[in-house]
Amino acid sequence: MKHYNIPIFIAYFGCPNKCVFCNQNKITGIETNIQPEEVKGIIDEYLCTLPSYGEKELAFFGGTFTAISIPLQKEFLSVAKEFIDKGLIKGIRLSTRPDNIDLNIVKMLKEYGVTTVELGVQSLDNKVLSLSERGYRKEEVERAVKLLKDFQIEVGIQIMPGLPGSSFKSDLQTVKEVIEMKPNFTRVYPTLVISDTKLEKMFKNNEFVPLSLDEAVDLTSVIIAVLENCKIPIIRVGLQPSEDIREEGVIVAGPFHPAFRELCESNIYRLFFEEKLITCEKIIVKVSHRDVSRVSGIRGSNKKYFGKRLEIIVDETIEKGSFYLNNQKYCRENLLKNVLRVVLNEADNN
């Protein structure tokens, strides 16, 4: 069934501290001081334009919702609850910090119809959390996830590879520990240096070196493979290119690309083709038109990389996610297992 989010942006609203990487107004492209009475109008407007079919959720994005005062939380939630009770929306989703979740808050969220909570976890390495000035430890994340799951509230986890003090190994360890928590979905945002943040000062003082684009693509390709192999959905990879964040000077440094996930997907194919070309001079790939852009790479990057050694044929009879290489059929699972084998072996040898 088609799913629709009705977004309410509460950038910076409720956030109790300012982490080294965060300038939320720049990241969301929205600066707001929204009031509860405005929420009803926004919902009504969206419901007028959205199709009558499909599931609809109200989504409070951008802030630390559960750090808002309890009375104000209830004001926001009660507006949405009216629409839930009328059957017009399915539920409410919101984002918050792990250290702003406790038993009383979770009970309240459940009472008002909250169905999904996204936690800005970022890392499960306590050293990285400290250097990023997150203000909590891994143990608080584990406690928050358990509490939410105990009340049958879906949990999303956001992680940020490439934070201060992190490494390829520590970021993968974070992913493995996230998997153990069994979230309903994840988001992966490689760390960017945004203007007017402490991280910008650290970068300019040579105290922090962000991942290069190639490093971020290689690391994130592995993260995608690990999460997908464990059947954990990844609903976004890379920061969404809002109008504001693409303004000159907003992104100071770091691996930003407007189609970052597509870079990772193309890289996953490239690694697979490289392995096959060890034992043959040329490969002929037959693929669905729905996958050909990833096989070819952004702006034909894979075709340029392999040259005449790679021939791509579009075949409308092939289902999405499968392809034939020199007449042998492969699927997504083959691609992901190859990434894990190749990249992790390289990491072990370095």
Regions found by a protein language model. Give the residues of each.
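Canonical Radical SAM [4Fe-4S] cluster-binding loop centered on the CxxxCxxC motif
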Residues: 2-38
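Auxiliary Fe-S-binding modules of radical SAM enzymes
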Residues: 2-4, 209-350
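Short glycine-enriched loops at secondary-structure junctions
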Residues: 10-14, 189-194, 240
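Short acidic/His/Gly/Ser-rich catalytic and metal-binding motifs that mark active-site loops
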Residues: 15-19, 194-201, 245-247
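Conserved non-cysteine loop/helix-boundary elements of the Radical SAM core domain that shape
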Residues: 27-41, 49, 62-217
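A short, N-terminal amphipathic alpha-helix
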Residues: 41-51, 221, 225
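Phosphate/pyrophosphate-binding loops at sites that engage ATP/ADP/AMP, CoA/4′-phosphopantetheine
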Residues: 47-54, 277-280
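Residue-level recognition of the N-termini of beta-strands and the immediately preceding loop/turn
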Residues: 54-58, 90-92, 283
